[in-house]
């Protein structure tokens, strides 16, 4: 790394003001910041000191996503060969590489288009390149069906957060992001139909998947959303590094479980199974905890998380037309997050004023 650092230091003057490549300054600084910690300092005293900067935060989130991504790649191959009937004669590596062949183009398109636009806009406007797309570029293919067209993945890079992209295509092109066939890779016209657990629940059918299948992830679904176990590994990474809020994360599961208990007679499935189906676990860990769109106050995080979990189950059970209620619940509560924080702050102000008056008297 010292060789690379020395090389960049020698090339840096060419990209600074007055250099031959001055107009590519944003591109150079983008690559430099990705590889090394920026050497810029504040003009006045720093008020907050922390070992984690934005780049490290984004990298931690990406690392937390890797277990779910790797299993998702394997599961794409597993579901394909299970549908066509050749699972017993297929090795682990055949399953994994088939899934990689299907998922890797989605990841490449997402990053190439998204980062390409990010670099181009930063270059035109002279802004610094934002590392945030390191996460969004991976989230987009992970929350899409494996059979989603690549043009859809490319267009998804225009939205942030990534969940908004899925919502847009869900309502604009429902046939490409719903049904039974889109979750199974390859030509499965003559294969056994594999409905997701959510679809079976919405149709009032008995679940053909065991709780173990749903926990480990051997079910059809979006690329990165099937394995609750791998998502749990990612949750531990986010919580140990303080990147995600445990208040929000736990509240989502609590709210979802309590509401699932209430609606258990309607849904026909066990309450805990609701937490393992669809994108509930993935949304609770990686989407609801987005520090930009979620509630900021501690009390607000509890309220925000409880409402997301409860609303996700309500949408699933009341409206079978939208079996994946987690997406709509998170987007709706993202809208109300500032209002939740406002009420929490106002309540705190009133409580302190009341306490001050009591002391004064």
Predicted regions and their residues:
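N-terminal signal-anchor module of multipass membrane proteins
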Residues: 1-107, 361
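C-terminal ends of transmembrane helices
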Residues: 42-48, 114-125, 162-163, 233-241, ...
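Structural signature of hydrophobic alpha-helical transmembrane segments
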Residues: 96-110, 150-154, 214, 218-228, ...
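Central hydrophobic cores of alpha-helical transmembrane segments in multi-pass inner-membrane proteins
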Residues: 106-120, 137-138, 157-161
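Cytoplasmic-side transmembrane-helix entry/capping segments in multi-pass membrane proteins
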Residues: 127-136, 153-156, 163-165, 246-254, ...
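Membrane-interface helix-loop-helix junctions at boundaries between adjacent transmembrane segments
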Residues: 128-186
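Long hydrophobic alpha-helical segments that form multi-pass transmembrane helix bundles
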Residues: 162-232
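Loop-to-transmembrane alpha-helix initiation sites
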Residues: 272-279, 301-303, 321-333
């Amino acid at each position: 790394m010292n060789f690379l650092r020395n090389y960049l230091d020698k090339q840096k003057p060419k990209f600074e003001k007055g250099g031959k490549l001055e107009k590519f300054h944003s591109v150079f600084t983008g690559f430099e910041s990705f590889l090394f910690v920026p050497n810029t300092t504040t003009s006045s005293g720093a008020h907050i000191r922390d070992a984690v900067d934005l780049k490290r935060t984004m990298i931690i989130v990406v690392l937390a996503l890797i277990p779910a991504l790797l299993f998702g790649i394997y599961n794409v191959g597993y579901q394909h060969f299970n549908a066509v009937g050749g699972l017993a004669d297929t090795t682990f590596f055949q399953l994994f590489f088939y899934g990689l062949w299907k998922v890797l183009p989605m990841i490449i398109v997402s990053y190439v288009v998204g980062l390409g636009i990010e670099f181009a806009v930063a270059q035109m406007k002279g802004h610094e390149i934002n590392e945030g797309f390191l996460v969004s570029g991976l989230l987009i293919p992970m929350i899409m069906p494996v059979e989603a067209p690549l043009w859809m993945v490319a267009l998804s890079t225009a939205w942030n957060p990534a969940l908004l992209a899925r919502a847009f295509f869900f309502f604009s092109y429902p046939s490409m992001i719903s049904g039974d066939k889109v979750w199974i890779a390859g030509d499965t016209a003559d294969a056994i139909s594999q409905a997701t657990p959510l679809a079976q629940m919405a149709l009032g059918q008995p679940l053909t998947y065991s709780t173990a299948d749903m926990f480990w992830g051997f079910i059809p679904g979006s690329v990165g959303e099937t394995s609750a176990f791998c998502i749990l590994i990612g949750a531990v990474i986010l919580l140990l590094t303080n990147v995600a809020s445990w208040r929000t994360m736990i509240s989502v599961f609590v709210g979802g479980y309590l509401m699932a208990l209430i609606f258990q007679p309607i849904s026909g499935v066990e309450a805990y199974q609701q937490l393992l189906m669809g994108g509930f676990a993935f949304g609770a860990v990686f989407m609801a905890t987005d520090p930009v769109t979620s509630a900021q106050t501690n009390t607000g995080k509890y309220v925000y998380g409880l409402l997301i979990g409860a609303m996700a189950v309500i949408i699933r059970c009341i409206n079978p037309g939208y079996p994946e209620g987690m997406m709509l619940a998170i987007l709706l509560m993202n809208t109300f997050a500032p209002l939740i924080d406002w009420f929490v702050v106002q309540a705190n102000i009133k409580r302190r004023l009341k306490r001050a008056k009591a002391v004064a008297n």
